[in-house]
C-alpha cells in the first residue's frame, strides 16, 4: 500500500496527486423496480461486493504491518477507526474497501488540446471505498516524477480531475470546454490488455446526450465494470446505479515540493504584518485549481479568500509547509527536502479528507432520500420508509460524523478547517431539521391511518350496538317457543328488521344533520316494531306458512 523507506530514497517525486470521486449508489435487485426497494435494501454493502469483478478488484483489510501504517493508525481516536479502515479482525458494517489489481507500471495519461505531449503519471493505487450510507469514493493515487514546473502541476490538477464536460457550447459542443477545463482525452493503462480511455466525444451528439445526460467518464465506468450504470437498465439483472455527489470535478489532494515558491510565499512584511502568500496569484491558482490567471479579480476579495483557505502554522521555518483547503482541494506546498510530509498526505490527511467527503456526501444523500419520501404521491408505508432512513441517519451520526478525530494539535486544526469550508456543521443541522420534519410528517400519516382504522371500528360498533341491545333486552328466551320465535315467519321478520336497523345505523354515522333526523325516526320506528313484534302472535299454521 505504501512506499518503503528504501523506495522513497531511490525516487524523487516532484508532486503527488490523489483524485477523489465521491458518488452515491443504489443496488437494484433483479426483477424488482428500484422504486419498490427500501433504503436499507438498496444500500447493503454485501450486494456491492458480489457485483465487483473479482479478477480486477480485491478486498483490502487494513493491517498495521509497516511503520507508516502504524503512524497512521495511532494518529486517530479508536472510535473513529471503524469509519476509516476495513478490518478483518474487527469487522464493521460501515465500510468496505477494495483495491484495483495493477500491473508493474500502470499509467494515468492526460491529453490536452493543442499540447504535443500528454502528462504521463504513474498510478500507485486505485481504491474503492463503499459506505453503508449509500455513498462511495473512487480514488486515483498518482506519482509525478517528470514535471517540476508550477504551470505543469496546475494543468495536471485542472485537466486530470474532470469526469465530464462542465458545459456544452452550441454548434461546437466540447471544443470550448477542452480549451479551458476538459482533457482532450483521459487514459488509464493498466497493462497491455487493459486500457481505458475517454475523449468525451459522446457529448458531441446531443441526441445521444439526451438519452443519458448524466453519463460519467468511460474511464470510471470501465474500471467499475458492467454492473455499474448511470441510468436505469432495461433488463432485469442485478446492477448498481451511481451518480456523482459533486459536479464534473473530482476532489484534488496534491503535495507539491518547490523550494523557491515556498520561500517566496513565506516572506513576511513586518510593516504590513502580512505574508507574501496573502496576495500571491500563484498560491491562489494552486489552492483553487486554476491553471492560468485567478478567476477572482478583486484584490481585497482574493486576499480574504486566501486568508480563509490557508493554514500557515509551519510557514517560515526549516521544512516550511503551507496548506490550502477549499471545497474541491487540499493542497500541501513545502520545501523539496521535506518529502516525509508526502507520506502524511497519503495517509493521515487523505483519511481526514475522505471522511469529510463521506460526511458531506451522506448528508446530501439523506436529504435526497427525505425529499423523495416526502414527495411520494401515495404515502404508502411512509412510516416504514422514514424508519429505515432514520436508522441509517443515527448510524451516520454515531459512527461517521465526528467533530474531532485526533488528539494531534495540527490534525484538530486541519479537520476543523475542512469542516468549515465544506460547511458540514450547518448542513448536518439542516439535515437534522429535515429528518425531524419528515418524522412529524410520517407520524401524521400514521395517526391518520390509525384514525381511519378507529373510524372503521366505530362504524362496525354502530352496526351491531342496537341489535346487541335488542338481544340483551329479550334475553336468551327469545329463542324459546314461549315468545314464538320458533315461528319461522316471525323469526324471518325480526332478522330483516335487525339487518335494516344495522344498515341504517351505519348510514347514520356518516350522514349529515338533516339525514340523521330522518334516519333516527326510521330507526326508532324499526326498534319499536322490533319490541312489539314478538307479542303480535303471528301464527305459524296460517295458510301459506310452512311449519
What residue ranges belong to the model's regions?
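Intrinsic-disorder/low-complexity, polar/charged segments
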Residues: 146-163, 364, 368, 375-382, ...
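Hydrophobic alpha-helical transmembrane segments and their immediately adjacent juxtamembrane loops
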Residues: 3, 7-12, 425-426, 430-547
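An acidic- and aromatic-residue-enriched active-site/binding cleft used to recognize and process polar
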Residues: 143-145, 336, 401
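Short, flexible coil/linker elements and helix-boundary hinge sites characteristic
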Residues: 31, 49, 187, 266, ...
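Membrane-associated alpha-helical segments
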Residues: 345-484
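N-terminal pre-transmembrane cytosolic regions of membrane proteins
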Residues: 1-277, 546
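N-terminal extramembrane/targeting module of integral membrane proteins
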Residues: 250-375
Amino acid at each position: 500500500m505504501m512506499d518503503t523507506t528504501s523506495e522513497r530514497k531511490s525516487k524523487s517525486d516532484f508532486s503527488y496527486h490523489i483524485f477523489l470521486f465521491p458518488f452515491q449508489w443504489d443496488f437494484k435487485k433483479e426483477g424488482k423496480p428500484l422504486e419498490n426497494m427500501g433504503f436499507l435494501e438498496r444500500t447493503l454493502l454485501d450486494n456491492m461486493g458480489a457485483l465487483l469483478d473479482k479478477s480486477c478488484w480485491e478486498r483490502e483489510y487494513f493491517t498495521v504491518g509497516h511503520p507508516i501504517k502504524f503512524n497512521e493508525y495511532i494518529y486517530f481516536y479508536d472510535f473513529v477507526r471503524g469509519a476509516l479502515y476495513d478490518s478483518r479482525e474487527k469487522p464493521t458494517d460501515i465500510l468496505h474497501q477494495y483495491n484495483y489489481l495493477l500491473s508493474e507500471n500502470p499509467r494515468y495519461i492526460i491529453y490536452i488540446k493543442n499540447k504535443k505531449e500528454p502528462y504521463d503519471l504513474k498510478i500507485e493505487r486505485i481504491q474503492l471505498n463503499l459506505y453503508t450510507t449509500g455513498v462511495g469514493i473512487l480514488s486515483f493515487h498518482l506519482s509525478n516524477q517528470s514535471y517540476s514546473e508550477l504551470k505543469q502541476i496546475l494543468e495536471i490538477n485542472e485537466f486530470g480531475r474532470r469526469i465530464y464536460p462542465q458545459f456544452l457550447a452550441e454548434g461546437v459542443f466540447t471544443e470550448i470546454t477542452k480549451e479551458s477545463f476538459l482533457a482532450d482525452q483521459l487514459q488509464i493503462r493498466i497493462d497491455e490488455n487493459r486500457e481505458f480511455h475517454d475523449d468525451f466525444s459522446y457529448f458531441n451528439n446531443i441526441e445521444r446526450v439526451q438519452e443519458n445526460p448524466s453519463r460519467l467518464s468511460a474511464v470510471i465506468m470501465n474500471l467499475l465494470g458492467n454492473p455499474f450504470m448511470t441510468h436505469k437498465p432495461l433488463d432485469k439483472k442485478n446492477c448498481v446505479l451511481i451518480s456523482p455527489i459533486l459536479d464534473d470535478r473530482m476532489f484534488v489532494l496534491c503535495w507539491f515540493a518547490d523550494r523557491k515558491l515556498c520561500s517566496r510565499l513565506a516572506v513576511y512584511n513586518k510593516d504590513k504584518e502580512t505574508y507574501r502568500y496573502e496576495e500571491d496569484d500563484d498560491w491562489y491558482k494552486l489552492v483553487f485549481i486554476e491553471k492560468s490567471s485567478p478567476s477572482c479579480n478583486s484584490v481585497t476579495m482574493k486576499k480574504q479568500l486566501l486568508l480563509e483557505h490557508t493554514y500557515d502554522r509551519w510557514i517560515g521555518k526549516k521544512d516550511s509547509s503551507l496548506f490550502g483547503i477549499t471545497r474541491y482541494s487540499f493542497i500541501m506546498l513545502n520545501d523539496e527536502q521535506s518529502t516525509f510530509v508526502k507520506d502524511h498526505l497519503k495517509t493521515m490527511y487523505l483519511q481526514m479528507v475522505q471522511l469529510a467527503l463521506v460526511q458531506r456526501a451522506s448528508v446530501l444523500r439523506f436529504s435526497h432520500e427525505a425529499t423523495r419520501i416526502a414527495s411520494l404521491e401515495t404515502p404508502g408505508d411512509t412510516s416504514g420508509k422514514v424508519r429505515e432512513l432514520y436508522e441509517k441517519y443515527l448510524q451516520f451520526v454515531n459512527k461517521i460524523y465526528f467533530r474531532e478525530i485526533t488528539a494531534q494539535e495540527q490534525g484538530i486544526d486541519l479537520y476543523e478547517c475542512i469542516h468549515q469550508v465544506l460547511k458540514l456543521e450547518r448542513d448536518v443541522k439542516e439535515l437534522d431539521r429535515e429528518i425531524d420534519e419528515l418524522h412529524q410528517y410520517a407520524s401524521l400519516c400514521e395517526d391518520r391511518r390509525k384514525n381511519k382504522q378507529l373510524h372503521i371500528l366505530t362504524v362496525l360498533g354502530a352496526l351491531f350496538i342496537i341489535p346487541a341491545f335488542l338481544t340483551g333486552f329479550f334475553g336468551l328466551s327469545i329463542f324459546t317457543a314461549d315468545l314464538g320465535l320458533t315461528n319461522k315467519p316471525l323469526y324471518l321478520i325480526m332478522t330483516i328488521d335487525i339487518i335494516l336497523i344495522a344498515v341504517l345505523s351505519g348510514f347514520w354515522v356518516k350522514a349529515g344533520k338533516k339525514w340523521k333526523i330522518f334516519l333516527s325516526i326510521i330507526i326508532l320506528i324499526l326498534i319499536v316494531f322490533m319490541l312489539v313484534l314478538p307479542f303480535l302472535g303471528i301464527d305459524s299454521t296460517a295458510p301459506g306458512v310452512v311449519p
